[in-house]
Swiss-Prot record:
The lineage of its organism: Bacteria, Pseudomonadati, Pseudomonadota, Gammaproteobacteria, Pasteurellales. It is a peripheral membrane protein. Transmembrane segments: none annotated. Keywords: Cell inner membrane, Cell membrane, Cytoplasm, Membrane. PANTHER family: HIGH FREQUENCY LYSOGENIZATION PROTEIN HFLD. It comes from the Bacteria. GO terms for cellular component: cytoplasm; plasma membrane. The gene is hflD. This is High frequency lysogenization protein HflD homolog. It holds the Pfam family DUF489.
Length: 205
């Protein structure tokens, strides 16, 4: 039997990354706590439970749950829809590429070693995360076309933040697949996903 609670949390993680990308592209900034939650998820590779990936508490996925609920209600921004569905598609490509998976695992291990020297949200770490996305994930499939302010999208720091958040989105997409998530559920069990997302969201104080 599918654990829709965990599937929805992982999918909310994907949607949260999509929302952060939109914020960065249109405003050059993102909610700081939610941004850190996304970055931190890259460092939690052996969680005891799914909540551990997102700071140990469901409240850290509030923005993602809000976004997911709007998306499942067909009320969401079309660009957001494109972002999170593209992340799921890239995860599908990654799951079939053993070389890319191994390289990604090695690069994430090296990323974790850099914590000794740099804060996770430092420009150096963001650059490393962005390079991991550009080197390994981006070549796997169709590039995600980000829409926003040209002035912001030209800034290297904003570019690195967006790619780092996209990498976190891939982390959540991998988790979604591990929890039993499938695209068929999004098509045929949308009401179940929506009801579960609303139930989880209502538990956040």
């Amino acid at each position: 039997m599918k654990n829709y609670h965990d599937i929805v949390l992982a999918l909310a993680g994907v949607c949260q990354s999509a929302k952060l990308v939109h914020q960065l592209a249109t405003e050059s900034r993102a909610d700081s706590e939610t941004f850190l939650t996304a970055l931190n998820s890259l460092f939690i590779t052996q969680p005891q439970r799914i909540e551990d990936v997102f700071g140990g508490e469901v409240r850290h996925l509030k923005l993602g749950l809000e976004t997911l609920i709007h998306q499942l209600n067909a009320q969401g921004d079309q660009n957001l829809t494109r972002y999170w569905l593209s992340l799921l598609a890239l995860e599908g490509k990654l799951s079939k590429n053993s070389d890319a998976k191994q390289t990604l695992g090695n690069r994430i291990s090296r990323l974790k070693e850099q914590e000794i020297h740099y804060a996770r949200d430092s420009e150096t770490m963001l650059s490393i995360m962005a390079n991991i996305y550009s080197d390994i994930i981006s070549p796997l499939g169709k590039k995600i076309h980000i829409l926003g302010s040209p002035d912001y999208l030209r800034q290297e720091l904003v570019q690195n933040k967006i790619r780092a958040v996209l990498l976190a989105g891939i982390r959540s997409a991998v988790l979604w697949k591990q929890m039993g998530g499938t695209k068929w559920q999004i098509l045929f069990f949308r009401r179940k996903l929506l009801a579960t997302a609303k139930q989880i969201y209502s538990s956040i104080y």
